[in-house]
Amino acid sequence: MITLAVDAMGGDQGLAVTVPGATAFLQAHPDVRLIMTGDETQLRQALTAAGAPMERIDICHTTQVVGMDESPQSALKNKKDSSMRVAINQVKEGKAQAAVSAGNTGALMATARFVLKTIPGIERPAIAKFLPSDTDHVTLALDLGANVDCTPEQLAQFAVIGSELVHALHPQKGQPRVGLVNVGTEDIKGTDTVKQTYKLLQNSKLNFIGNIESNGILYGEADVVVADGFVGNVMLKTIEGAVKFMSGAIRREFQSNLFNKLAAVAALPALKGLKNKLDPRKFNGAILLGLRGIVIKSHGGTDETGFRYALEEAYHEAKSAGLSKIEQGVAEQLAALETAKAVQNENADGL
Protein backbone atom coordinates (compact mmCIF):
# COMPACT_ATOMS: atom_id res chain seq x y z
CA MET A 1 0.00 0.00 0.00
CA ILE A 2 1.34 3.41 -1.04
CA THR A 3 0.62 6.32 1.31
CA LEU A 4 0.71 9.90 0.04
CA ALA A 5 0.38 13.07 2.11
CA VAL A 6 -1.75 15.78 0.52
CA ASP A 7 -1.79 19.47 1.40
CA ALA A 8 -5.54 19.82 0.97
CA MET A 9 -5.66 23.58 1.59
CA GLY A 10 -2.90 24.68 -0.81
CA GLY A 11 -3.34 26.26 -4.23
CA ASP A 12 -5.48 29.02 -5.66
CA GLN A 13 -8.73 27.14 -5.00
CA GLY A 14 -7.78 24.79 -2.17
CA LEU A 15 -10.40 22.16 -1.32
CA ALA A 16 -12.43 22.88 -4.48
CA VAL A 17 -9.59 21.32 -6.49
CA THR A 18 -7.67 19.05 -4.14
CA VAL A 19 -10.67 17.05 -2.89
CA PRO A 20 -12.23 16.09 -6.27
CA GLY A 21 -8.74 15.49 -7.67
CA ALA A 22 -7.85 13.22 -4.76
CA THR A 23 -11.20 11.42 -5.02
CA ALA A 24 -10.72 10.62 -8.72
CA PHE A 25 -7.15 9.51 -8.04
CA LEU A 26 -8.19 7.14 -5.23
CA GLN A 27 -10.91 5.62 -7.41
CA ALA A 28 -8.23 4.75 -9.98
CA HIS A 29 -5.74 3.38 -7.44
CA PRO A 30 -7.09 0.91 -4.87
CA ASP A 31 -3.52 0.38 -3.58
CA VAL A 32 -3.22 3.95 -2.22
CA ARG A 33 -4.05 5.64 1.08
CA LEU A 34 -4.03 9.40 1.53
CA ILE A 35 -3.20 11.50 4.55
CA MET A 36 -4.97 14.78 3.86
CA THR A 37 -3.87 17.77 5.93
CA GLY A 38 -6.07 20.77 6.61
CA ASP A 39 -9.09 21.94 8.55
CA GLU A 40 -10.84 18.71 9.58
CA THR A 41 -14.40 20.06 9.50
CA GLN A 42 -14.05 21.60 6.04
CA LEU A 43 -12.17 18.58 4.74
CA ARG A 44 -14.68 16.04 5.98
CA GLN A 45 -17.58 17.99 4.49
CA ALA A 46 -15.85 18.34 1.12
CA LEU A 47 -14.80 14.67 1.00
CA THR A 48 -18.30 13.47 1.87
CA ALA A 49 -19.83 15.70 -0.81
CA ALA A 50 -17.35 14.35 -3.38
CA GLY A 51 -18.12 10.73 -2.50
CA ALA A 52 -14.52 10.03 -1.55
CA PRO A 53 -13.60 6.54 -0.24
CA MET A 54 -13.17 7.59 3.40
CA GLU A 55 -11.86 4.17 4.42
CA ARG A 56 -8.61 5.03 2.61
CA ILE A 57 -8.29 8.60 3.83
CA ASP A 58 -6.82 9.82 7.09
CA ILE A 59 -7.49 13.45 7.98
CA CYS A 60 -4.74 15.26 9.85
CA HIS A 61 -6.19 18.44 11.33
CA THR A 62 -4.16 21.63 10.95
CA THR A 63 -4.94 25.17 12.03
CA GLN A 64 -2.96 27.20 9.49
CA VAL A 65 -2.66 27.72 5.74
CA VAL A 66 0.33 29.17 3.88
CA GLY A 67 -0.86 32.04 1.68
CA MET A 68 0.00 32.00 -2.02
CA ASP A 69 1.82 35.34 -1.63
CA GLU A 70 3.41 34.57 1.73
CA SER A 71 7.18 34.78 2.01
CA PRO A 72 9.20 31.60 2.61
CA GLN A 73 10.60 33.15 5.79
CA SER A 74 7.11 33.81 7.16
CA ALA A 75 5.94 30.30 6.30
CA LEU A 76 8.92 28.74 8.07
CA LYS A 77 8.71 30.92 11.15
CA ASN A 78 4.99 31.42 11.63
CA LYS A 79 3.21 28.49 9.94
CA LYS A 80 4.50 25.40 11.73
CA ASP A 81 0.97 23.96 11.88
CA SER A 82 0.13 24.70 8.26
CA SER A 83 -1.35 22.06 5.99
CA MET A 84 1.82 22.33 3.87
CA ARG A 85 4.27 21.85 6.73
CA VAL A 86 2.34 18.98 8.30
CA ALA A 87 2.08 17.17 4.94
CA ILE A 88 5.87 17.32 4.54
CA ASN A 89 6.28 16.18 8.15
CA GLN A 90 4.45 12.96 7.22
CA VAL A 91 7.29 12.12 4.82
CA LYS A 92 9.94 13.02 7.38
CA GLU A 93 8.28 10.78 9.99
CA GLY A 94 7.94 7.85 7.57
CA LYS A 95 4.14 7.94 7.58
CA ALA A 96 3.95 8.77 3.87
CA GLN A 97 6.21 8.00 0.91
CA ALA A 98 5.56 11.35 -0.77
CA ALA A 99 3.89 14.71 -0.21
CA VAL A 100 1.92 16.76 -2.75
CA SER A 101 1.09 20.47 -2.55
CA ALA A 102 -0.32 23.09 -4.91
CA GLY A 103 0.76 25.81 -2.50
CA ASN A 104 3.22 28.68 -2.66
CA THR A 105 6.34 27.44 -4.51
CA GLY A 106 8.89 29.43 -2.51
CA ALA A 107 7.37 28.43 0.81
CA LEU A 108 7.11 24.79 -0.27
CA MET A 109 10.75 24.67 -1.35
CA ALA A 110 11.97 26.36 1.84
CA THR A 111 9.83 24.19 4.10
CA ALA A 112 10.72 20.94 2.34
CA ARG A 113 14.41 21.79 2.43
CA PHE A 114 14.23 22.65 6.14
CA VAL A 115 12.28 19.54 7.12
CA LEU A 116 13.77 16.89 4.83
CA LYS A 117 17.27 18.29 4.16
CA THR A 118 19.17 17.72 0.92
CA ILE A 119 21.02 14.68 -0.38
CA PRO A 120 24.66 14.87 0.82
CA GLY A 121 26.72 16.93 -1.62
CA ILE A 122 23.71 18.70 -3.16
CA GLU A 123 23.71 22.37 -2.19
CA ARG A 124 20.22 23.27 -3.41
CA PRO A 125 17.15 21.34 -4.54
CA ALA A 126 15.85 22.01 -8.04
CA ILE A 127 12.38 21.97 -9.54
CA ALA A 128 12.31 19.15 -12.08
CA LYS A 129 9.60 18.08 -14.46
CA PHE A 130 9.13 15.49 -17.18
CA LEU A 131 8.26 17.10 -20.52
CA PRO A 132 6.67 15.34 -23.51
CA SER A 133 8.22 14.98 -26.94
CA ASP A 134 7.03 14.23 -30.46
CA THR A 135 7.53 10.53 -29.68
CA ASP A 136 6.72 8.57 -26.52
CA HIS A 137 10.01 9.82 -25.10
CA VAL A 138 9.97 12.16 -22.09
CA THR A 139 12.72 14.52 -21.00
CA LEU A 140 13.49 15.58 -17.44
CA ALA A 141 14.06 19.34 -17.29
CA LEU A 142 15.57 21.17 -14.31
CA ASP A 143 15.82 23.73 -12.72
CA LEU A 144 12.43 25.23 -13.55
CA GLY A 145 12.39 28.14 -11.14
CA ALA A 146 13.79 27.34 -7.71
CA ASN A 147 17.25 28.89 -8.18
CA VAL A 148 17.44 31.85 -10.54
CA ASP A 149 21.17 32.37 -10.01
CA CYS A 150 23.43 29.32 -9.93
CA THR A 151 27.13 28.54 -9.84
CA PRO A 152 28.66 26.09 -12.34
CA GLU A 153 29.00 23.58 -9.50
CA GLN A 154 25.30 23.81 -8.68
CA LEU A 155 24.29 23.38 -12.32
CA ALA A 156 26.55 20.34 -12.51
CA GLN A 157 24.89 18.98 -9.36
CA PHE A 158 21.50 19.38 -11.04
CA ALA A 159 22.82 17.36 -13.96
CA VAL A 160 23.96 14.63 -11.58
CA ILE A 161 20.70 14.28 -9.66
CA GLY A 162 18.64 14.48 -12.85
CA SER A 163 20.73 11.82 -14.57
CA GLU A 164 20.64 9.51 -11.57
CA LEU A 165 16.86 9.80 -11.23
CA VAL A 166 16.21 9.05 -14.91
CA HIS A 167 18.64 6.11 -14.76
CA ALA A 168 16.90 4.75 -11.63
CA LEU A 169 13.50 4.99 -13.32
CA HIS A 170 14.66 3.58 -16.68
CA PRO A 171 17.81 1.48 -16.09
CA GLN A 172 17.19 -0.53 -19.25
CA LYS A 173 17.92 2.55 -21.38
CA GLY A 174 21.52 2.92 -20.20
CA GLN A 175 23.13 6.16 -19.12
CA PRO A 176 20.82 9.14 -19.76
CA ARG A 177 21.90 11.75 -22.28
CA VAL A 178 22.48 15.05 -20.49
CA GLY A 179 22.21 18.38 -22.32
CA LEU A 180 23.00 21.90 -21.12
CA VAL A 181 20.48 24.53 -22.27
CA ASN A 182 22.27 27.28 -24.19
CA VAL A 183 21.79 29.80 -27.00
CA GLY A 184 23.70 27.55 -29.38
CA THR A 185 25.31 24.13 -29.53
CA GLU A 186 28.90 25.41 -29.81
CA ASP A 187 30.95 25.21 -26.61
CA ILE A 188 32.16 28.81 -27.04
CA LYS A 189 28.64 30.22 -26.63
CA GLY A 190 26.80 31.26 -23.50
CA THR A 191 27.57 33.06 -20.26
CA ASP A 192 30.73 32.41 -18.28
CA THR A 193 28.71 30.27 -15.88
CA VAL A 194 27.37 28.12 -18.70
CA LYS A 195 30.83 27.78 -20.27
CA GLN A 196 32.35 26.67 -16.96
CA THR A 197 29.48 24.24 -16.42
CA TYR A 198 30.10 22.82 -19.89
CA LYS A 199 33.72 22.08 -18.99
CA LEU A 200 32.73 20.44 -15.70
CA LEU A 201 30.17 18.20 -17.38
CA GLN A 202 32.52 17.42 -20.25
CA ASN A 203 35.05 15.99 -17.79
CA SER A 204 32.48 14.20 -15.62
CA LYS A 205 31.31 10.59 -15.83
CA LEU A 206 27.89 11.67 -17.05
CA ASN A 207 26.76 10.93 -20.60
CA PHE A 208 27.06 14.61 -21.49
CA ILE A 209 26.07 15.34 -25.09
CA GLY A 210 26.88 19.06 -24.99
CA ASN A 211 24.78 22.17 -25.36
CA ILE A 212 21.17 21.91 -26.45
CA GLU A 213 18.95 24.68 -27.75
CA SER A 214 15.47 24.96 -26.28
CA ASN A 215 13.81 24.22 -29.62
CA GLY A 216 15.26 20.69 -29.51
CA ILE A 217 13.98 19.72 -26.09
CA LEU A 218 10.53 18.57 -27.24
CA TYR A 219 12.14 16.45 -29.94
CA GLY A 220 13.75 14.17 -27.39
CA GLU A 221 17.33 15.16 -28.18
CA ALA A 222 18.30 14.60 -24.53
CA ASP A 223 16.98 12.63 -21.56
CA VAL A 224 17.95 15.33 -19.06
CA VAL A 225 18.24 19.06 -19.78
CA VAL A 226 19.82 21.45 -17.28
CA ALA A 227 19.44 25.20 -16.85
CA ASP A 228 19.40 27.71 -14.03
CA GLY A 229 15.97 28.51 -12.60
CA PHE A 230 15.60 31.76 -14.55
CA VAL A 231 16.23 30.19 -17.96
CA GLY A 232 14.34 27.03 -17.04
CA ASN A 233 11.23 28.86 -15.88
CA VAL A 234 11.14 31.09 -18.97
CA MET A 235 11.59 27.98 -21.13
CA LEU A 236 8.76 26.13 -19.36
CA LYS A 237 6.33 29.07 -19.50
CA THR A 238 7.12 29.58 -23.19
CA ILE A 239 6.36 25.93 -23.93
CA GLU A 240 3.11 26.11 -21.96
CA GLY A 241 2.11 29.32 -23.73
CA ALA A 242 2.92 27.89 -27.16
CA VAL A 243 0.82 24.80 -26.48
CA LYS A 244 -2.16 26.93 -25.39
CA PHE A 245 -1.76 29.19 -28.42
CA MET A 246 -1.60 26.27 -30.84
CA SER A 247 -4.60 24.51 -29.27
CA GLY A 248 -6.65 27.71 -29.42
CA ALA A 249 -5.57 28.49 -32.98
CA ILE A 250 -6.56 25.02 -34.20
CA ARG A 251 -9.95 25.27 -32.46
CA ARG A 252 -10.67 28.73 -33.87
CA GLU A 253 -9.67 27.67 -37.37
CA PHE A 254 -11.98 24.65 -37.38
CA GLN A 255 -14.85 26.82 -36.08
CA SER A 256 -14.32 29.64 -38.58
CA ASN A 257 -16.72 28.42 -41.30
CA LEU A 258 -19.04 25.57 -42.21
CA PHE A 259 -16.51 23.76 -44.40
CA ASN A 260 -13.92 23.76 -41.63
CA LYS A 261 -16.53 22.56 -39.13
CA LEU A 262 -17.30 19.59 -41.40
CA ALA A 263 -13.58 18.92 -41.76
CA ALA A 264 -13.27 18.98 -37.97
CA VAL A 265 -15.83 16.17 -37.70
CA ALA A 266 -13.73 13.99 -40.01
CA ALA A 267 -10.56 14.91 -38.13
CA LEU A 268 -12.10 14.42 -34.68
CA PRO A 269 -10.16 11.25 -33.73
CA ALA A 270 -6.85 12.87 -34.65
CA LEU A 271 -7.80 16.09 -32.87
CA LYS A 272 -8.69 14.20 -29.70
CA GLY A 273 -5.35 12.41 -29.83
CA LEU A 274 -3.53 15.71 -30.30
CA LYS A 275 -5.45 17.35 -27.46
CA ASN A 276 -4.66 14.45 -25.17
CA LYS A 277 -0.96 14.59 -26.04
CA LEU A 278 -0.70 18.35 -25.54
CA ASP A 279 -2.91 18.66 -22.45
CA PRO A 280 -0.65 20.49 -19.95
CA ARG A 281 -2.63 19.05 -17.05
CA LYS A 282 -1.20 15.62 -17.83
CA PHE A 283 2.26 16.93 -17.07
CA ASN A 284 1.31 18.75 -13.87
CA GLY A 285 3.45 17.77 -10.93
CA ALA A 286 7.08 18.86 -10.58
CA ILE A 287 9.59 17.09 -8.36
CA LEU A 288 11.58 19.03 -5.77
CA LEU A 289 14.70 17.10 -6.69
CA GLY A 290 17.70 16.86 -4.39
CA LEU A 291 15.77 16.36 -1.15
CA ARG A 292 15.91 13.29 1.08
CA GLY A 293 12.26 12.58 0.40
CA ILE A 294 9.66 12.96 -2.33
CA VAL A 295 7.80 16.26 -2.59
CA ILE A 296 5.67 17.05 -5.64
CA LYS A 297 4.67 20.61 -6.53
CA SER A 298 1.36 20.96 -8.34
CA HIS A 299 0.62 24.11 -10.31
CA GLY A 300 -1.25 26.47 -7.99
CA GLY A 301 -3.84 27.36 -10.61
CA THR A 302 -4.56 23.85 -11.84
CA ASP A 303 -7.99 22.21 -11.88
CA GLU A 304 -9.03 18.88 -10.36
CA THR A 305 -7.74 16.92 -13.36
CA GLY A 306 -4.35 18.59 -13.14
CA PHE A 307 -4.16 17.94 -9.41
CA ARG A 308 -4.97 14.30 -10.01
CA TYR A 309 -1.99 14.07 -12.35
CA ALA A 310 0.23 15.63 -9.69
CA LEU A 311 -0.88 12.80 -7.42
CA GLU A 312 -0.11 10.36 -10.24
CA GLU A 313 3.44 11.73 -10.39
CA ALA A 314 3.84 11.27 -6.64
CA TYR A 315 2.44 7.75 -6.91
CA HIS A 316 4.85 6.71 -9.65
CA GLU A 317 7.83 8.24 -7.86
CA ALA A 318 6.89 6.48 -4.62
CA LYS A 319 6.17 3.15 -6.29
CA SER A 320 9.40 3.12 -8.30
CA ALA A 321 11.42 4.16 -5.23
CA GLY A 322 13.68 5.93 -7.73
CA LEU A 323 14.75 8.68 -5.34
CA SER A 324 15.71 6.16 -2.66
CA LYS A 325 18.07 4.47 -5.13
CA ILE A 326 20.04 7.49 -6.29
CA GLU A 327 22.08 8.58 -3.26
CA GLN A 328 24.95 6.16 -3.91
CA GLY A 329 25.08 7.08 -7.59
CA VAL A 330 24.95 10.78 -6.74
CA ALA A 331 27.89 10.39 -4.34
CA GLU A 332 29.99 8.66 -7.02
CA GLN A 333 29.14 11.22 -9.69
CA LEU A 334 29.85 14.14 -7.35
CA ALA A 335 33.26 12.67 -6.53
CA ALA A 336 34.00 12.53 -10.26
CA LEU A 337 32.86 16.14 -10.57
CA GLU A 338 35.29 17.20 -7.85
CA THR A 339 38.09 15.52 -9.77
CA ALA A 340 37.01 17.27 -12.95
CA LYS A 341 36.92 20.60 -11.14
CA ALA A 342 40.43 20.05 -9.75
CA VAL A 343 41.77 19.26 -13.22
CA GLN A 344 40.00 22.34 -14.59
CA ASN A 345 41.58 24.53 -11.92
CA GLU A 346 45.04 23.08 -12.57
CA ASN A 347 44.70 23.80 -16.27
CA ALA A 348 43.59 27.36 -15.51
CA ASP A 349 46.57 27.89 -13.17
CA GLY A 350 48.94 26.66 -15.85
CA LEU A 351 47.84 29.26 -18.38
Curated annotation (Swiss-Prot):
Protein name: Phosphate acyltransferase
Coiled-coil residues: none
Enzyme class: transferase
Complexes and interactors: Homodimer. Probably interacts with PlsY.
Pathway terms, separated by semicolons: Lipid metabolism; phospholipid metabolism
Subcellular location: Cytoplasm
Record's function text: Catalyzes the reversible formation of acyl-phosphate (acyl-PO(4)) from acyl-[acyl-carrier-protein] (acyl-ACP). This enzyme utilizes acyl-ACP as fatty acyl donor, but not acyl-CoA.
Keywords, in A-Z order: Cytoplasm, Lipid biosynthesis, Lipid metabolism, Phospholipid biosynthesis, Phospholipid metabolism, Transferase
SUPFAM superfamilies: Isocitrate/Isopropylmalate dehydrogenase-like
Alphabetized GO MF terms: phosphate:acyl-[acyl carrier protein] acyltransferase activity
Organism phylogeny: Bacteria, Pseudomonadati, Pseudomonadota, Betaproteobacteria, Neisseriales
Keyword Glycoprotein: no
Organism: Neisseria meningitidis serogroup C / serotype 2a (strain ATCC 700532 / DSM 15464 / FAM18)
Enzyme Commission identifier(s): 2.3.1.274
